[in-house]
Amino acid sequence: MHHEDPLGSLFCRDLNWVSTGQVTSEEAVLGQGNISCGSWIENRRDDNPLAATRTAWVLGFITAFNQYGAKPQRDVSGGKDTEVLMARIDDHCKRHPLDNLYKASAALVDELRQ
């Protein structure tokens, strides 16, 4: 006889509502999202060509959220320009240098959603 655990079902259902900022170590992060915030800050400071690639990664992350994230928001950035968005990533990375770019980007989206 199979007995459903109502508390377990509730717990699993509630996991679907975890914000993007609460990322588990099991998230599949591809490409530039794996670099550390320390590297992000260093490359932005040195005007390294990698900074443009990493900026494009963050913009792609935001675009993907706009496409596949919670609706009805069309543009979570609210039309902010790239420099404003990157300044917010800079701020997060200065405060959390051990985070990766994915976590900083997820935190930015969470902040923009509020």
Identify the function of each model-found stretch.
Residues 1-2, 95:
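Intrinsically disordered, low-complexity cationic segments
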Residues 12-25:
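Bacterial Sec-dependent signal peptides at the C-terminal "C-region" and cleavage site
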Residues 83-112:
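Short, compact, well-ordered microdomains
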Residues 25-88:
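Short N-proximal segments of mature Sec-exported proteins
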Residues 4, 9-14:
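Bacterial N-terminal signal peptides
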Residues 10-11, 35, 91:
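Secreted/extracellular small peptides and ectodomain modules produced from precursors
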